Amino acid sequence: MSYLPCELHCHSNHGEGNFSVSELLQKSADDHLALIAITDKNTTDGFAELDDSVTPSIKGMECATPYGSLLALGIDSAVDTLNTTPDNIDSVIQELRGNGAVVGISHPFDENGAWKFNLRNHRNIDFIEVWHGAFTFANVENDKALAMWTELLDKGCHIACTYGRDWKNDENSGHFGCTYLDIDGEINQHNALKALRMGKSVASTGVKFFFRVHQKGVTYTIGETLKKGSSVFSFFTDLHSREKNSGAEEVEYQTIKLITNGGVCVMETVVSERHIHINLKNNHWYRAELWGKVDGEKKLLAVTSPIYTA
């Protein structure tokens, strides 16, 4: 398998959603999603109704508090968040990870659930929802989340990016994206979580976009660590993937950017480019971004998790 479309933030009628679990699974299959995560707020009551024969799924929960929300993926039972405070969040995350969960920050700048925790060890975070909800020009929370992610990468954290629709109902008026996961082997919870934990993810408006790096006869993929020096980046772009999910806006795909520490662009090329040479610096991260125009306005349309150098 190679970079399959997934939705990692879904709600059923056991929580805030309007769908039954069976309806959610069928709608996911109809939407050609390879896998979803059920993440009802502070409950796992929907787990018993999951059916991987319809759509493979991850058992998860949105740990919702007055100070922000976490996504805990790969859990077997509900997590008690009643006593979670801004100052004990590190111990909560450590306990989740100790029980095998993959832990992410959900919509850190959402007006109804902004991140207010005093997290000390960001290295215990596996992923961050850099994009959330429908893609509109009014959705400024995504720009802030992307900047937060960049700051964490600059601190040396290896954190993957995800998109979260926060799927609750049949709202179809917006343009919704997906998270592409590089799932190796059978499509199931174990392999999907392995991909996310290893940082093999892409947040996208729909377009399929990823890269590999070739260095001294060895090929590296997103999420991996390699040495500094001369390298060749190979880009893979399918502009028509999930095209049915596009909205009424006019989208023009234009350029690929390679971004590194501090959000600095070290390379920009046309979207049709397949291979570029670049000299990687030590102790840096590098992510690829696909840019274009939406109704004439310049917009980021896909972003990969980084590779790292050491």
Where are these regions (language model features)?
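A metal-dependent hydrolase metal-coordination microenvironment
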Residues: 1-106, 111-123, 129-151, 155, ...
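Catalytic pocket-lining loop regions of alpha/beta-barrel enzymes
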Residues: 126-127, 194
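C-terminal functional module detector
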Residues: 1-3, 23, 160, 167-310
